[in-house]
Amino acid sequence: MRKWFTPRRLAIGAVWLLVLMQFVPTWLWNTNPPAQSKPHWDSPQTHALAQRACFDCHSNQTLWPWYSYIAPGSWLITRDVSSGRRHLNFDDWQTALSRQDRFPLDQQIQRQISRGEMPPRYFTVLHPNAVLSADEQQQLIDGLAKTIQAK
């Protein structure tokens, strides 16, 4: 009796699955729409830190790396950027400010940065320049709080 699940057949099946996954066109959503409204930054340093650590997911200025076009990584990256833009988009600043009625935006940002939730660890592995020192984290938290207060 022939075995159906031999290592060779499993390997061939896995390769076919990877090939077929490439036909799901998530890269069509890898867009950078024009900015609606931008924050009035409290300082150029705050802006530079936000660009370095936040803008790839939380703005319409995403730099889409080559691996964002290859499945299954493209699915994860597209989902993360869409989610990041939905929660906080620096290029749609007025919408971000209007959503802070339940929990103030500066407190949300402070909590996530100080807990090490943002930027996520898997992001900083691929983007080591996004890693912020403790001083830079505090400077970003303080600068964003001032930027939010200035509206």
Predicted features, each with a name:
Residues M1-P7:
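Short, Lys/Arg-rich N-terminal segment immediately upstream of the first membrane anchor
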Residues A50-T62, M118, L140:
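The canonical Cys-X-X-Cys-His
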Residues W66-P72:
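Short cysteine/histidine-rich zinc-coordinating motifs and their immediately flanking basic loops
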Residues G116-E117, T124-K151:
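C-terminal capping alpha-helices of c-type cytochrome domains
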Residues R9-P25:
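Hydrophobic membrane-insertion alpha-helices, especially the h-region
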Residues W75-L126:
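Extracytoplasmic electron-transfer domains, predominantly the class I c-type cytochrome c fold
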Residues W29-A50, L63:
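Electrostatic cytochrome c docking/interface patches
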